[in-house]
Design a protein with these regions (language model features):
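Short glycine-rich phosphate-binding loop at a beta-alpha junction
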Residues: 1-6, 162-165
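Short, hydrophobic alpha-helix immediately C-terminal to the catalytic nucleophile
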Residues: 64, 177, 264-268
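Amphipathic alpha-helical transducer elements in NTP-driven molecular machines
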Residues: 60, 105, 260-264
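N-terminal small/polar loop signature for handling phosphorylated ligands or for N-terminal nucleophile
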Residues: 3-87, 179-242
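Gly/Ser/Thr-enriched, mixed-charge loops and adjacent short helices
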Residues: 86-217, 221-222
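Active-site catalytic microenvironments for nucleophilic, acid-base chemistry
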Residues: 69, 114, 182, 269-270
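Short, conserved glycine- and acidic-residue-centered signature motifs
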Residues: 25, 29, 104, 260
């Protein structure tokens, strides 16, 4: 299984010599995924990927679900996660939908270092080989429904809980946003940050929801709408951050919640 986020390799930090030819510049995560499909197909491995014309993306949590749903041997997500676009790379997931841990991760790294030649097919030849399979909406619908069923509370009454949501120009709407809607919430969008855009034009500092400054726009919307919560996801949607209003009617101040605090609150609620 292969997925991709919205990044394009632009060398924003200027670390490459502009006088040298560089075929990487300008490539998107989708291009890298198609190249990976060519490597897999050339080596007799079947790969599943969204069609190039798809209007949605596969967030990292959904990738983990899709691996198990398709009984795949693993998954690969081309993403820079919450880092600058120049850090576009890959996240590998095992057949369990989890990232490898020690010592497996080190063994994989050593295997990569020993590779001296690469068998590769062009994208067109990889598709013609029959080893590239295009994902339909079935897995996506299954993922949203699975998440919805995990909810411990009934759907809220209209306006009972007002939630502002931002994917920070990433792909989080396709998981967190849709799950909120499926469960009966009416998430209030941050209009400037809803469109997937790997240059993050409307994000302060960094697209990392664990950095409070990147929630400035969302907090502004929350104050205007007297929202109870702000929920933000990082570009590939496997990292969350948020704000909570200090008053139940949404008229208080907003308190930033880091990952440890969110985990503690959710664990306490579930127990």
């Amino acid at each position: 299984v292969l997925a991709y986020d919205v990044r394009k390799f632009l060398d924003k930090r200027g670390v490459y010599n502009p006088g040298l030819p560089n075929p990487v510049l300008g490539l998107t995560s989708r291009d890298f995924c198609q190249y990976a499909c060519g490597v897999y197909a050339a080596n007799g491995i079947h790969a599943h990927i969204l069609p190039a014309e798809a209007s949605r993306f596969v967030p990292t949590p959904e990738l983990s679900y899709t691996i198990r749903e398709l009984r795949a041997h693993g998954g690969l997500n081309m993403t820079a996660s919450h880092n600058p676009p120049d850090d576009n790379g890959s996240k590998f997931y095992t057949e369990l939908g989890a990232q490898p841990v020690a010592p497996e991760d080190q063994l994989m790294s050593e295997l990569v270092d020993r590779v001296s030649t690469i068998r590769h097919l062009s994208w067109a030849d990889a598709v013609r080989s029959g080893r590239v399979h295009f994902l339909d909406d079935a897995c996506h619908r299954g993922y949203i429904e699975m998440c919805r069923k995990e909810s411990l509370i009934p759907p809220p009454k209209l306006d009972e809980i007002r939630v502002v949501f931002t994917p920070l120009h990433g792909v989080g709407y396709f998981c967190a946003g849709e799950v909120l809607e499926a469960q009966g919430f009416h998430p209030i969008p941050v209009p400037e940050q809803m469109t997937p855009d790997g240059s993050f034009p409307n994000v302060t500092k960094t697209p990392n929801p664990e950095v409070p400054e990147c929630l400035d726009l969302a907090e502004g919307v929350a104050r205007e709408k007297h929202a109870h919560l702000v929920i933000a996801t990082d570009p590939d949607a496997d990292r969350y951050g948020g704000l909570a209003n200090t008053k139940t009617d949404g008229t208080g101040d907003y308190r930033y919640l880091n990952g440890n605090e969110l985990a503690a609150l959710l664990t306490h609620f579930k127990l």
